[in-house]
Amino acid sequence: MKSAFRFLSFLCAIWFLAACANNIFQITQSAPGEIDQAASTPTPTPTPYYYIVKPGDTLWTISQKVGVDIEVLIQVNELSNPDVIQPGDRLLISKKVTISGKPLPTPTPTPIPCMQGCIQPPEGCVVKGFRARLDGMKLYVLPEDAIYPVQRGETWFCREEDAIAAGFVRWTPSGPKIP
Amino acid sequence: MMDIRFSLHPTLLRAFQRALAIVLVLGLLLSISPPRPTQAESDPAPPPDAARVIELITSLSGEEPFQTTRIYDRRGILLADIDDRGRRTIVGYNEIPDIVIQATIATEDRRFFQHQGIDYLAIVRALWQNTQSETIVSGGSTITQQLARILFLSPSERYEQSIQRKLKEVELAQFLETYYTKEEILAMYLNMVYYGNQAYGIAAAAEVYFNKSLSELTLAEAALLAGLPQAPAMYDPFRYPERALERQRTVISLMQEAGFLTSSEADALRAQPVLFHPYQRPRNRAPHFVNYIRDILIERFGTEGIHRGYQVHTSLDLRYQALAERIARAQVKRKGKKYRFSNAAVVIIQPQSGGILAMVGSIDFNDKKIAGQVNMTTVPRQPGSAIKPIVYAAAFERGWSPASIIWDLPVYYTLDGRRRYAPRNITGRFYGPLRLRMALANSLNVPAVKLLQAIGIPAVLETAEKLGIKAWRQPQDQYGLSLAVGGYEVPLLELTHAFATIANQGVYTPLYPITEIRDGAGRVVFQAKPRETQRQAISPLAAYQLTSILSDARARRMMFPRPSPLDTSQITAVKTGTTDGWRDNLTVGFTSYLAVGVWIGNTNNKPMRNAVGVYTAGPIWHDVMEAIWADESLYDALGYADGVLPQGFILPPDTVTIPVCDWLPGKFTPRCPRMVEEVYPASLPTSLPTGRDRGYCLPAGAAPSPPEAYFLPLPKDTRSAAAARNWVRKRFLRAVQHLNDCDTTPNKRPLVKQPKLLPPRQWVLSAEKMKTSVHLQASNQYGE
């Protein structure tokens, strides 16, 4: 009986010591500087290297989308005439430079299809419906429209009639014509 | 009458004289043909107001005249003009002072009120004068003819000296005279004609040259302006002031001739100096915000449509903007070198109205080195841990609570069948069983990923969308488990908006950076209606549970030791974020009436050095909050003009608080070190754990309690359950027994001692007493 009690208190002591050790261990471990860096991501968003110019893009809209100064875009891409960029042009967004100063071989050019979080259109469907941020009005644009690329696409239609049937109104440079 | 003196080649001159002669003859013929409608004579239209002038010009020229659109801050301070096409403000006839009308008529067309569109007398005189002097001294164009030219002829046609053009002009002038009153014609003319220096119309001219409104013009100034339309470039008052003054003298003489001035008045006027006060464009103090507003306007009204003279009233408050900018700049200056960051962005949102009080897109718009023109509040960036509250919001919406238990133990997930993803905490350690409160407050990665795995990615995407995150629009299968730790980009504006929704008891209000738009005629074309467009995004309870965790300074102590910039003088809820490779640092936090988001980093995505959100973005967030609280005069923008801000957060009705056993991360023992109160819906899930829910019993507070209050369940899947069991065994040397049927009756608890119940948390506040300030004691539960 007594030995059993001793054994138990021995166990208790060990448990106590273990707990203490655990505590000390923890205090020394919680480094205050490093807090909440997100864990390595399994599907990281690729660093953009190239941007493929879409119809209606201007250097300004591209610089806004990719977060690179317009001057830098002009310099890096050695654009002689920055007013002329063609849809399909490939713009270098960032250059990786090794310590020796040599540029790294560029990985497979990664086009940034939708920087603003838009949805890729189904094949051949280019009528883009969106809601105006001002008042939520349902509008649709076509690729030739000036604001086509900067919109956050919401709904894609293959024909204008479908967009109209869904209650969307055609956007025009002088404002939508409300029927 | 044209009064341009310049020599002309004799052949050209002769051609012109011939043209004028033909005009004279044809004009006489034409003047007989269209009879004036009798109706117009018997019932003359009243002098047109601004709206009527716009209507007339639009119907005649086929397009609405462009006007300067102005953007104001919330207190009516002008932020910027949109005047790329030129400046113009259309005014009604009665708003034009008589002196302007007199000076214009005397200069351009003395018999304007008498003639029928063509002043033959003037033409004859012009012809005679021109023949005499062998140069063109004057042309005989009336105001009506000039208006016809502006309205109907294309710019290239306008300056063409041909008989056809002249004939067309005469015909059109007579058309105008037939159908419109003299007041209408004069009002259209004074609003359309160009005065130089991008000023179209008399109101814009008064503004551009004298920085005055029309009614403030003096006679001398009116005389100067009236002389400009003939040759705005030649008489440009800024470039050739002496020519402009000479021209003004001529106008004064013409006014005297026309009988509008006596000779003594004219002399007095000539002696009077004219002072130019060029219009100062408002210094653009919120360039990113103005561009953002411009974008929204273009999106709705089109690239041409924005030039319609809108008065755009926005939610921005320049005082908040200046304050945020100053604090952000100071922090970059102070700590930028140490952590290697060069830029910061701040956005302040008012949750109830959806208004943006400040938008600092970069610390210097004009600094090319940091790509200052890029608005870092609207560019999508990885949010890091700052996204975790969204995941927890989705969980709380689906029955989880801050007291729910999650096991922070090594785990891996197999991605696309091959690669393994093993989430790790920043400390590299695993902390065993945890309540969600501790997991979120200390920003642990493993529990966040496990939680996401448990509730599913679609659930989180749905909740995020409801809260205000619009950036995640890809198909659901494009998103992986790194969603829980901020692997997917979100603009700071949207992230802060989502926090604002949580701050507003889960009620989503669309962003309303624009509060009201009036068109050129003063009619309201848009008004923000936050109350009518709000919707409950997540339940008030879920919002409260999140808020209570994010404002729980005790719970986050392990990771955020004192002193921490996250601790503020008033109760706030806050979350930080740091992304992979030290690229972005965030701190987003809120009170019930204010949400502030801060980003720190490098625009070109260059990594910082050992920079974590709490020490880089945190101080900016802290200082912005404190600076706002310190200045009572700012409270009106938050909806509390009386100078008393509410404290804490509203506890939703139909809830109960129940004490549950709590422990620090990694320090679980079956004997509870303390009890804390958690909030539960009044209808509690009280079902007892069954034999299948294997786990450990914990001491409970008062019955009835939800099972998680007194029962520590093992994870459901066998692999994790085995790991959990091992973890417990290793630490407690089999001292703990599995108890499948925990006894919840108060005196039959599995453990001996009832632990001390902690006093209520800081954030607990009685409902509907938002305005009563609650006195709170700082508590010291963790032996600090």
PLM segments and residue spans:
Chain B
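N-terminal type II signal-anchor transmembrane helix
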Residues: M2-Y72, T89, R111, T131
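Extracytoplasmic
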Residues: E64-T69, D73-I77, G86-R88, I96-Q102, ...
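Conserved catalytic neighborhood of penicillin-recognizing serine enzymes
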Residues: Q129-E157, S215, Y279-R285, W400-V460, ...
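Soluble, non-transmembrane domains of envelope/secretory-pathway proteins that act on or interact
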Residues: G27, S33-P48, T58-S59, Y72, ...
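Active-site beta-strand/loop architecture of penicillin-binding DD-peptidases
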Residues: R294-L297, S342-S385, I390-A394, E465, ...
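Active-site-proximal helix/loop microenvironment
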Residues: P273-Y279, K470-V524, R531, R535-A537, ...
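Non-catalytic, structured segments within soluble enzyme domains
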Residues: S33-Q39, T135-R326, L451, E462-D477, ...
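Short pre-catalytic segments that frame enzyme active sites
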Residues: I54, R70, L78-T89, A204, ...
